[in-house]
Amino acid sequence: MFKSVVYSILAASLANAGTIPLGKLADVDKIGTQKDIFPFLGGAGPYYSFPGDYGISRDLPEGCEMKQLQMVGRHGERYPTVSLAKTIKSTWYKLSNYTRQFNGSLSFLNDDYEFFIRDDDDLEMETTFANSDDVLNPYTGEMNAKRHARDFLAQYGYMVENQTSFAVFTSNSKRCHDTAQYFIDGLGDQFNITLQTVSEAESAGANTLSACNSCPAWDYDANDDIVNEYDTTYLDDIAKRLNKENKGLNLTSTDASTLFSWCAFEVNAKGYSDVCDIFTKDELVHYSYYQDLHTYYHEGPGYDIIKSVGSNLFNASVKLLKQSEIQDQKVWLSFTHDTDILNFLTTAGIIDDKNNLTAEYVPFMGNTFHRSWYVPQGARVYTEKFQCSNDTYVRYVINDAVVPIETCSTGPGFSCEINDFYDYAEKRVAGTDFLKVCNVSSVSNSTELTFYWDWNTTHYNASLLRQ
């Protein structure tokens, strides 16, 4: 796979020789060799398949026919945000102004190291062939989206064989929009696809893919008292180790934490990162669980507002399923952010909400929530509705793996019988009220998600935002 990707990129590079980011010769031996750490990067690193696939075949069960397909995807690999880049640059400033020879795990900085953020215009943006730090980088968001499109055709191409004209939906974040466009490009020119760009501003209210932005009641400090109980001495230990190896360096625990982000986003930009080799395996586990803990209590089941936020998109998904027989469009593809996907999965009950994560230690038995498993860069959640004989079923496929509903999985391929699913969905949203809980009326008059139904007359074309 890696070789085929490299050959494809090299072919493209010959046509764009004037803009090739050549990198260094040593890169060839390093690029694509760090996939084992992707699960520990909290979703900031490149895409990888869901590890807990339970051995269930993703293929449509024998004798069944797909009736509807929905997909909610995250934008592809990107550069850091403006705010995070500021923090990374602060640590880089300390390192770049160190006047002595580096020792230990920082010794790579002696070898003409090139900082991966070359242009501030790249911040917040998708990594592409044009802005990647190395021509051989297989992890660009552009390549990921195009590869996803080819995988989609291989898995579900029959769903669009007789429907060459359809809409694809994206938030108006530029990186989400770019991912959607690269995906469309990857499908080929045999389709007439209308890209609907839906606003993610708070004024969009309920008519959005990004309900969290329309929720002024969202408290970003909620549950900090729980998360802050987590032991972060591993960060102190990293800083102490690096400072001991390099006299006078004076890195802090904040710098140590920043290095994890640096590692992830550098891999996105150049295909590998020497910074990632700074950490021990134990330190990666500690960092990864902190990301899980923080997400669980800020964007997942541990924050009581999330089920209501996620219900906005989940209710629309269920409505589409119920209308599959009368809707001309059978495939519904949408691109947005990781938070929106996490909110959706929380409401859907795919993320375990029966056992709250503990901040007292790193749990290994019974812990099924890992942020990076669900929302790596380029994450994708498919909702399949298929018919077998006279019965119809629903199941979820997350990042290439079938993930059954725990209490409803007795159907073919560990799916949920359709009426049982509707009962399940009704119970999941019982007591939720996105408009009321989020106080949406204070920022918008829009009280319903309608873009899946009125796109052909409204023609959504929100201005793109660098966020």
Curated annotation (Swiss-Prot):
GO terms for biological process: cellular response to phosphate starvation; phosphate-containing compound metabolic process; regulation of cell size. It catalyses: a phosphate monoester + H2O = an alcohol + phosphate. The keyword Transmembrane does not apply. It holds the Pfam family His_Phos_2. GO terms for molecular function: acid phosphatase activity; nucleoside triphosphate diphosphatase activity; ribonucleoside triphosphate phosphatase activity. Induction: Expression induced during phosphate starvation. Repressed by inorganic phosphate. Residues 1-17 form the signal peptide. Its EC number is 3.1.3.2. It is found in: Secreted. CDD domains: HP_HAP_like. Glycosylated during secretion across the membrane. Belongs to the histidine acid phosphatase family. Present with 1110 molecules/cell in log phase SD medium. Partially mediates extracellular nucleotide derived phosphate hydrolysis along with NPP1 and NPP2. PANTHER family: ACID PHOSPHATASE PHO11-RELATED, MULTIPLE INOSITOL POLYPHOSPHATE PHOSPHATASE-RELATED. This is Repressible acid phosphatase. It comes from Saccharomyces cerevisiae (strain ATCC 204508 / S288c) (Baker's yeast).
